[in-house]
């Protein structure tokens, strides 16, 4: 079970130049494909005069949703090296965009691979990397007389309280590290009037 993952906390910018071609790299924390589409549209608009706007992203704690795009560069010379930097740093929930201004000299496939890899690496180096926990949200409904027992378990296990309502039937929404979720569910479900 994946319990934690690495992502970037802050944006990072990188730069690489080779034979008068300029590579501007931007790393962003993202959590949805919609965020990615919005950011890409903004970069294409802002750098409308650039030859290529290549990118790669990785989403989710399991790192199963990803994509690499060469945007007209020779196949696998731009998106794959960018994605390779994401993988080698074991990051997720990240988008790296590399904007290329053509300098008039062809770099060849190996030159392009190095340039996109180095630009992406520089963007990651200028971003703050953090480790986050994978959390699970638990909703528990209970009768009011069980309040003290529920709150004792909450105090002991220290989940984050998202919301709580108190009435004849009470409800509490908790967020806890995924590896501890089953234990919390078990302890709550074993409560009874005594």
Residue ranges and their predicted role:
Residues 141-158:
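Short amphipathic alpha-helix segments
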Residues 1-77, 163, 181:
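C-terminal regulatory domains involved in ligand/effector binding and gene-expression control
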Residues 168-169:
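N-terminal positively charged helical leader segments and presequences
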Residues 47-50, 157-162, 189-194:
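A common structural junction motif
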Residues 78-126:
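Active-site beta-strand/loop microenvironment that shapes enzyme catalytic pockets
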Residues 128-144, 172-174:
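Short glycine-/aliphatic-rich beta-strand segments at the starts of folded cytosolic domains
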Residues 174, 180-183:
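Terminal, non-globular segments
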Residues 50-53, 127-136, 194:
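Flexible, glycine/charged-enriched surface loops at secondary-structure junctions
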């Amino acid at each position: 079970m994946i319990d934690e993952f690495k992502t970037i906390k802050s944006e990072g910018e990188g730069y690489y130049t080779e034979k008068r071609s300029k590579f501007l790299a931007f790393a962003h924390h993202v959590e949805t494909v919609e965020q990615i589409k919005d950011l890409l549209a903004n970069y294409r608009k802002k750098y409308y005069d650039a030859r290529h706007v290549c990118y790669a992203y990785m989403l989710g704690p399991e790192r199963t949703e990803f994509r690499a795009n060469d945007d007209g560069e020779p196949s696998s010379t731009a998106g794959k090296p960018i994605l390779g930097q994401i993988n080698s740093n074991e990051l997720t929930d990240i988008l790296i965009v590399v904007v290329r201004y053509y300098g008039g000299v062809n770099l060849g496939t190996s030159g392009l691979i190095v340039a996109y890899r180095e630009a992406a690496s520089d963007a990651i180096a200028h971003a703050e990397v953090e480790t986050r926990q994978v959390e699970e949200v638990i909703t528990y409904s209970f009768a009011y007389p069980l309040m003290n027992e529920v709150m004792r378990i909450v105090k002991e296990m220290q989940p984050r309280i998202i919301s709580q309502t108190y009435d004849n039937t009470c409800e509490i929404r908790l967020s806890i590290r995924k590896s501890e979720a089953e234990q919390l569910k078990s302890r709550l479900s074993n409560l009874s009037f005594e």
